[in-house]
Amino acid sequence: MLISVPATSANLGPGFDTLGLAVDLRNEIVIKPSKFLSLSTHGEGADNPKIKKNSLFLSIFNENYKRLSGKANNFRFEFTNRIPISRGLGSSSAVIVAALSGAYAMAGVKYNKREILNQALRYEHHPDNITPAVMGGFNVACVEGDRVYSKKRRMPDYLRAVVVVPNRTISTARSRTVLPKMYRKEETVYSLSRAAYMTALFMSESWDLLRIASKDKLHQARRMKMMPELFDVQKLALKQGALMSTLSGSGSTFFNLAYEKDTDRIAQSLRARFPQFRVFVLALDNNGVITK
């Protein structure tokens, strides 16, 4: 059994804990029945003893496999990690979604993606990463009780993500400590109006107005101050033709959306200016989690 989950970029500027989309950079897990527990890890984090334990995956998989009355006692898990870890590209959400999908598949229980998404909410209380990880595409999502309500828009083939991955992390926990407990009404309205406008632009494919819609006053600049180079990343990407340039999740990765014809120029400029950072040019993903 192969489980494949895409990386995701959440918030997209003003859509704090609400908006997200999937990009074609995938973690894969092969699961096979075995006489004893066996783990192998390749790619991102393969040299990190904590990552190699895959504790979060195993905890969620075992809990749900047991809940679903699975019969096998042990499995061999082969992890291929391509999503940078703790960089704001949804690596934790990918683990959660993969573990749940794997538990259902190996237990032989039929399920739909909405069920996986609602189960994922038990482990990740914000829907902005888990929703595109499950569904693919661009998603606007909210939580009511123990359910995620979301709307998906498929992304066109002529757009690409230019993703800048810094050489150090900004932890989600730390990044939340820099946010105020209270916001001024003007800040809230500024970002709320742009999140609504951005959603309309994505749904209508009005890409050339995203530069206005992607501005934010709630979280982005406050978090970027923890890594000031990110202001220069954003400025250069927009100068070179990015449609929008936003902090990915809580960082430290920066997400840039662009027309395919502009991506080489944007990526080359970013690589030349920031040689210490990794730059990926990625297709956008419309499939979400895949089980086969």
From Swiss-Prot:
<dbReference type="Pfam" id="PF00288">
    <property type="entry name" value="GHMP_kinases_N"/>
</dbReference>
<dbReference type="InterPro" id="IPR006203">
    <property type="entry name" value="GHMP_knse_ATP-bd_CS"/>
</dbReference>
<dbReference type="InterPro" id="IPR014721">
    <property type="entry name" value="Ribsml_uS5_D2-typ_fold_subgr"/>
</dbReference>
<dbReference type="InterPro" id="IPR020568">
    <property type="entry name" value="Ribosomal_Su5_D2-typ_SF"/>
</dbReference>
<keyword id="KW-0791">Threonine biosynthesis</keyword>
<dbReference type="GO" id="GO:0005524">
    <property type="term" value="F:ATP binding"/>
</dbReference>
<comment type="function">
    <text>Catalyzes the ATP-dependent phosphorylation of L-homoserine to L-homoserine phosphate.</text>
</comment>
<keyword id="KW-0963">Cytoplasm</keyword>
<dbReference type="InterPro" id="IPR013750">
    <property type="entry name" value="GHMP_kinase_C_dom"/>
</dbReference>
<feature type="binding site">
    <location>
        <begin position="84"/>
        <end position="94"/>
    </location>
    <ligand>
        <name>ATP</name>
    </ligand>
</feature>
<dbReference type="InterPro" id="IPR006204">
    <property type="entry name" value="GHMP_kinase_N_dom"/>
</dbReference>
<keyword id="KW-0067">ATP-binding</keyword>
<dbReference type="GO" id="GO:0009088">
    <property type="term" value="P:threonine biosynthetic process"/>
</dbReference>
<dbReference type="GO" id="GO:0004413">
    <property type="term" value="F:homoserine kinase activity"/>
</dbReference>
<dbReference type="GO" id="GO:0005737">
    <property type="term" value="C:cytoplasm"/>
</dbReference>
<comment type="pathway">
    <text>Amino-acid biosynthesis; L-threonine biosynthesis; L-threonine from L-aspartate: step 4/5.</text>
</comment>
<dbReference type="InterPro" id="IPR036554">
    <property type="entry name" value="GHMP_kinase_C_sf"/>
</dbReference>
<keyword id="KW-0028">Amino-acid biosynthesis</keyword>
<keyword id="KW-0547">Nucleotide-binding</keyword>
<dbReference type="Pfam" id="PF08544">
    <property type="entry name" value="GHMP_kinases_C"/>
</dbReference>
<keyword id="KW-0808">Transferase</keyword>
<dbReference type="InterPro" id="IPR000870">
    <property type="entry name" value="Homoserine_kinase"/>
</dbReference>
<protein>
    <recommendedName>
        <fullName>Homoserine kinase</fullName>
        <ecNumber>2.7.1.39</ecNumber>
    </recommendedName>
</protein>
<comment type="similarity">
    <text>Belongs to the GHMP kinase family. Homoserine kinase subfamily.</text>
</comment>
<keyword id="KW-0418">Kinase</keyword>
